[in-house]
Amino acid sequence: VSHLHEDKKILNRVRRLKGQIHAVEAALTQPEPSCIDILQQVAAIKGAVNGLMSELIEEHLREHVIQDPEAVNEQDLQEFLKLLKRYG
């Protein structure tokens, strides 16, 4: 996992999630929060979490599972990751 502390893209995703969650919390403290607005915000959070999961899985595969990066068919790997994002 040591490679993750240097990954700015993943850290930025986490920071955006933090901001989105903070926005939901703030909306819930309003006198009459809009259920639709909150549901839209939560749906965005869900999408962001799924994106983060996909990115972490790809990093894990590339750093810890694939033993020989030269032996990997990059097109097949990308197809697998695409399926994982869609159905995972």
Task: Set out the residue ranges of the language-model regions.
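Solvent-exposed interaction patches of small proteins and small membrane subunits
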Residues: 1-88
